[in-house]
Amino acid sequence: MSVHIEAKQGEIAETILLPGDPLRAKYIAETFLEDVVLFNQVRGMLGFTGTYKGEKVSVMGTGMGIPSISIYVNELIQSYDVKNLIRVGTMGGIQADVKVRDVVIAQAASTDSQINRNTFAGVDFAPVADFSLLKKAYDAGVEKGLSLKVGNVFSADRFYNDQLDKQQLADYGVLGIEMEAAALYTLAQKYGRRALAILTVSDHIFTGEETSAEERQTTFNDMIVVALEAAIK
């Protein structure tokens, strides 16, 4: 048991999927896993463990933003010795060829958060994905005939930020904007764990095209299958 997770030792798998929305965690568990057990509901942050193709896998919500995911990733690693952490979430696209509902694998994560600046005394640490997980996810997506995008994403510290120069990010090749990957990658590298963010484009920041809240909560199955296949390969 940790401060924010009530699971007993052994109830959380070495590999965990991390959606921001706890209701998406519930959807993933009920739709894709077998022999599901609820291990956490502290603060409504639902966590489940089950099996996928015979392999033990967990899934748990993290909430929104770098501070929230940092709490749960720290506790999952330090209190439960989780080895592989795969974020499955949404992002806003900013490239012309990144379409709504596309699946994006975040190779690296830039950020305007000051967390890493504080940690590294002003040094610009570059948070990157684990290559082995990235390759497994990419291969799984290609095998299923998906059109995947792989590249840099931007982990924003604020959801509403009129001052952020999104066009400049696009000009430098950033695929889209989300809010958690930079923290996930940094903590995984700190503790010697493997991490990856697989994201579905829920809206396009420049065109205004978007998906519904219900669709974000209960679909985006391509992303989830890619994550699960990467988790067990």
Swiss-Prot record:
> Can you state which reaction this protein catalyses?
a purine D-ribonucleoside + phosphate = a purine nucleobase + alpha-D-ribose 1-phosphate; a purine 2'-deoxy-D-ribonucleoside + phosphate = a purine nucleobase + 2-deoxy-alpha-D-ribose 1-phosphate
Q: Name one GO cellular component term.
A: cytosol
Tell me which InterPro entries the record gives.
DeoD-type, Nucleoside_phosphorylase_CS, Nucleoside_phosphorylase_d, Nucleoside_phosphorylase_sf
Where along this sequence does the record place binding of a purine D-ribonucleoside?
A: 4, 178-180, 202-203
- Site positions (Important for catalytic activity) are 216
Which Gene3D superfamilies does the annotation name?
Answer: Nucleoside phosphorylase domain
Query: Could you cite one Gene Ontology molecular function of this protein?
Result: purine-nucleoside phosphorylase activity
Question: What residues form the catalytic site here?
Answer: 203
Keyword check for Lipid biosynthesis, yes or no: no
Keywords assigned by UniProt? Glycosyltransferase, Transferase
What SUPFAM superfamilies does the record tag this protein with?
Answer: Purine and uridine phosphorylases
Q: Where does phosphate bind?
A: 20, 24, 43, 87-90
Which cysteines form disulfides? none
Biological process GO annotation list? purine nucleoside catabolic process
The EC designation for this entry is: 2.4.2.1
* Quaternary assembly: Homohexamer; trimer of homodimers.
Q: What does this protein do?
A: Catalyzes the reversible phosphorolytic breakdown of the N-glycosidic bond in the beta-(deoxy)ribonucleoside molecules, with the formation of the corresponding free purine bases and pentose-1-phosphate.
| NCBIfam families assigned | deoD, PRK05819.1, PRK13374.1
| Family, as annotated | Belongs to the PNP/UDP phosphorylase family.
Q: Can you name this protein?
A: Purine nucleoside phosphorylase DeoD-type
Q: Which organism is it from?
A: Listeria welshimeri serovar 6b (strain ATCC 35897 / DSM 20650 / CCUG 15529 / CIP 8149 / NCTC 11857 / SLCC 5334 / V8)
Taxonomy, top ranks, is: Bacteria, Bacillati, Bacillota, Bacilli, Bacillales
